[in-house]
A protein has these predicted regions:
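Accessory substrate-recognition/RNA-binding modules or partner subunits associated with SAM-dependent
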Residues: 2-136, 153-155, 159, 166, ...
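Short amphipathic alpha-helix with an adjacent loop that forms part of the alpha/beta core around
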Residues: 81-83, 289-296
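Class I S-adenosyl-L-methionine
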Residues: 95, 143-183
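Conserved hydrophobic/aromatic beta-strand scaffold that supports enzyme active sites
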Residues: 139, 365-369
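Conserved S-adenosyl-L-methionine
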Residues: 172-292, 308, 312-316
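Short SAM/SAH-binding signature in class I
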Residues: 296-302
Length: 373
């Protein structure tokens, strides 16, 4: 059985390493995701454990699609009555590029029409559409007039960990945060500090990693749990295994701080919701006044970079303060800055030993490494 796990552009190799660690086969990174093979058990495990995957798709068909008629016929030809009942709800998402069909909303509607027509012709009843919470989420991908139809195992984005309460103005998506933590190479033994933690995505993802807490363990449910062939016994065993393999998170290992008290309070609530609130050290403090908790460790921050927060003049001065504070207060540490503004990054005034290209949504970003001696 073949699968495709999508991810943030730039995290493909990180996701591939996760899939290899899970024991899946034929792991091949691609553009924006990773192909892999396995059983339904592997698909379930992928939804439960993967930290950097946005979605886990199961391709069920691929066919030439030079026209809307070809799209309808290709989708209608599939055995949809074996994949869903007329009582189930569905939703279709479409992504298109370099094809004769150019409107994604129209393509999604055409795909939906073919599916419900096939179910009606086989059963006499049409299933309903539920765009917000469907029983079966279907992905239609059209590239260069070749259409691939996939089932979305989770049914929703895997960044929805189940612990987040009210998001702050510009939250860092959990899957991207997990990727940033992985890219730092943090050893999970020395201190991990985020001095601009916002609602806590980076410390929380670091804590889940260090405690071997499955990324999807708090998620209320996944789409595949509503499918006709769902194996409830297998899923129960996987959940029990995930619970028993969790580790105790050491105290004084992970630190989150922010100068905005509302953000820190929200981060605490998110951590409490995740069951690890007592183990993360939170503080309400300005970064320039924060003291290093040890002689060495990993610091990572996602300072505002002008797309949604702050203004250019204030941010220029702020980035200069970041560099000054690194030099004065964090000698012996490895520091990482994630930003979508390269001009601002230069204001740090330190030479980066590594630059990693990533995307935060449509924004091209850099993860910059600074070795502080």
């Amino acid at each position: 059985m073949k699968f495709f796990a999508t991810t943030t552009k730039g995290l493909e190799d990180v996701l591939a390493a996760e899939l290899i660690a899970l024991g899946t086969r034929d792991v091949v990174p691609g553009n924006g995701g990773v192909n892999f093979s396995g059983t339904f058990k592997d698909g379930y495990k992928a939804c439960l454990w993967l930290r950097t995957a946005n979605r886990v798709l199961q391709p069920i068909a691929s066919f030439p699609c030079p026209s809307e008629e070809a799209l309808y016929e290709g989708v209608y030809a599939l055995n949809w009555d074996e994949l869903m009942t007329s009582q189930m709800t569905l939703a279709v998402g479409a992504k298109l590029r370099d094809s004769e069909i150019t409107h994604s909303h129209y393509a999604a509607l055409k795909t939906k029409d073919a599916i419900v027509d096939k179910i009606r012709d086989r059963t006499g009843q049409r299933p309903n559409v539920d765009a917000k919470d469907p029983d079966l989420q279907i992905n239609m991908h059209l590239a260069r007039n070749q259409c691939t139809i996939s089932l979305d195992l989770a049914g929703t984005g895997l960044h929805k960990r189940g612990y987040r309460r009210d998001p702050t103005i510009a939250p860092l998506k959990e899957t991207l945060a997990a990727g940033l933590v992985a890219l730092t190479g943090w050893d999970q033994a020395s201190p991990f500090v985020d001095p601009m933690c916002g609602s806590g995505s980076l410390p929380l993802e670091a804590a889940q990693l260090a405690s071997n807490h499955a990324a999807g363990l708090l998620s209320p449910d996944f789409g595949f749990q509503r499918w006709p062939d769902f194996n409830a016994g297998l899923w129960k065993n996987l959940l029990e295994e995930a619970e028993t393999t969790k580790r105790e998170l050491p105290a004084n290992l992970i630190f989150g701080s922010d100068r905005d008290k509302r953000s820190v309070d929200l981060a605490r609530r998110n951590a409490d919701s995740a069951g690890i609130g007592a183990k993360i050290r939170w503080s309400y403090n300005d970064f320039t006044k924060l003291e290093a908790p040890a002689s060495q460790g990993t610091l990572i921050c996602n300072p505002p970079y002008g797309e949604r927060l702050g203004n250019e003049e204030e941010l220029t001065a702020f980035y200069r303060k970041i560099g000054d504070t690194f030099k004065q207060n964090w000698k012996g540490w490895t520091a990482w800055v994630f930003t979508g503004n390269l001009a601002l990054a230069k204001q740090v005034g330190l030479k980066a030993s590594r630059r990693i290209v990533l995307y935060n949504g449509p924004i091209e970003c850099r993860l910059l490494k600074y070795d502080l001696y």
